[in-house]
């Protein structure tokens, strides 16, 4: 059964032979999991004390075996996409390496993320609204420049801002109608002074 409070992990890049592969971890145990598998190049550095929004070079290890050299990025909540603690492990992009690192992360306490679960958490934690969550998928699926631009406008809140504006206008109109029903004479007076000039 899926628990929305589990620490989750997934491969964030296309799985292919490439220069870099990224494994993303999000949740309250992200740093604890990292501490079990990451050895910073500077051995004096405590993994739990790594600074927010900084890159750290080191090795991913499975016990004493070095699996890969990597760069780790720390994004502590609420200053991350999901508003949770997030760790990104940038390793070499070979298929075998990426899956080995992901399996180490899963073995040490994370659960494999469902498709779209990072964006779902961003929505549930108030980082983005529903319109912006839909825009993320539209951006990923965009096939041309116009679709990309429209998705970015929506992701930046363009549609959300317009919806908020329309909501405020509707609330104002409802209040005006309720006022007219409560006091018809006042309504007639208001119409006289708010009607457009001929």
Language model: regions and residue ranges:
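A glycine-rich (often HGG/GG-containing) alpha/beta subdomain
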Residues: 1-149, 153, 157
